[in-house]
Amino acid sequence: MKALEWMGDSLKILDQTRLPVEIKYRMAATYEEVAEAIEKMEVRGAPAIGAAAAYGYALGAIGYSGELAGLSAHMEKVQHRLAETRPTAVNLFWALRRMEDRLRDQHEAKELAEIRQALVAEAESIAEDDRRVNRLIGEHGNAIVTAEANILTHCNAGALATVEYGTALGVIRAAQQAGKKVHVYAGETRPFLQGARLTALELMNDHIPVTLIADNMAGFLMQQGNIDLVIVGADRIAANGDTANKIGTYSLAVLAHAHGIPFYVAAPTSTIDLKVPSGQDIPIEERNPKELREVFGVQVAPPEVPVYNPAFDVTPAKLITGIITEKGIVTSPYSVNLLKMMVRS
């Protein structure tokens, strides 16, 4: 199953809200359809959101039928619509900046067709970069996995969250392919259940041993000595190493620290936002209260109960053992070492 696939004039998006019960695709032919798919979490995961937004931007140009002189104003509208879909995942904004830069490079183009072709090529490049980068993350991350390891992960940072292979699950895949005996504990990840619905499905399809647990069982497993390592993905990493990821990640980091268990973040360098000094400056998306009052249409709480539903939390850098990127593994002091890595790249 691919999270997304370019079909030449539309974007084929796997509707992940239907998994694992049903495999259904959306054929997005306009940028508005791509924006809706991102908002509704049909496509999710920071790298996949970035790639989808890039294709959505290209579709904005493909769908434009006005004069060449009016394209710039139209594409500003397209970019704004895509940018407002999910505020926390920085890959979204990184991809849109790349697309905007490619559009500016076409200022001497005389035909719309030439510009459209260039934008599609840039979106394809972003997608291909993600495939390559995730494999490198896996290669680097394999070094921190012992010959036999029980690994805890949270949410879904696998192939379904990227164009291909995955970040946190990419490390696990690389370890298995290297002949290591890995067993994964997947937290269910309330309220949207990405761990139960997506991570468990991915790992089972790849014949990687996995056990599903409720989110509130992690501490007990650590206390029993059943967790050797925690690996999670990321939606935005601040300049000081503070990391925004799916809600519940911070709790796991605190538990891992209390039990002396290594806690790693796996993410591409496109997730690092040096313009954001610390986690306090990362915008945190708050989602629809219905996601807590209901579970897939079944009411599980009083309909009038007040709800607080942040989609992400921020793990302080001091709780992170290392950040696994395609450039290597970065360790503390993050303010220094992340900057060094980004300057070199």
UniProtKB/Swiss-Prot annotation:
Keyword Amino-acid biosynthesis in annotation: yes
Domain of life: Bacteria
Active site residues per record: D235
Biochemical pathway: Amino-acid biosynthesis; L-methionine biosynthesis via salvage pathway; L-methionine from S-methyl-5-thio-alpha-D-ribose 1-phosphate: step 1/6
Enzyme class: isomerase
GO annotation, biological process: L-methionine salvage from methylthioadenosine
Binding site residues for substrate: R44, G45, A46, R86, Q194, N245, K246
EC number(s) stated in the UniProt entry for this protein: 5.3.1.23
Family matches, as Gene3D superfamilies: translation initiation factor eif-2b, domain 1 (1.20.120.420), Translation initiation factor eif-2b, domain 2 (3.40.50.10470)
Site (Transition state stabilizer): C155
Any one GO molecular-function label of the UniProt entry: S-methyl-5-thioribose-1-phosphate isomerase activity
InterPro entries in the record: IF-2B-related (IPR000649), IF-M1Pi (IPR005251), IF_2B-like_C (IPR042529), Initiation_fac_2B_a/b/d (IPR011559), M1Pi_N (IPR027363), NagB/RpiA_transferase-like (IPR037171)
Annotated keywords: Amino-acid biosynthesis, Isomerase, Methionine biosynthesis
Protein purpose: Catalyzes the interconversion of methylthioribose-1-phosphate (MTR-1-P) into methylthioribulose-1-phosphate (MTRu-1-P).
Similarity field: Belongs to the eIF-2B alpha/beta/delta subunits family. MtnA subfamily.
Name assigned to this protein: Methylthioribose-1-phosphate isomerase
Species the sequence originates in: Desulfitobacterium hafniense (strain Y51)
Gene for this chain: mtnA
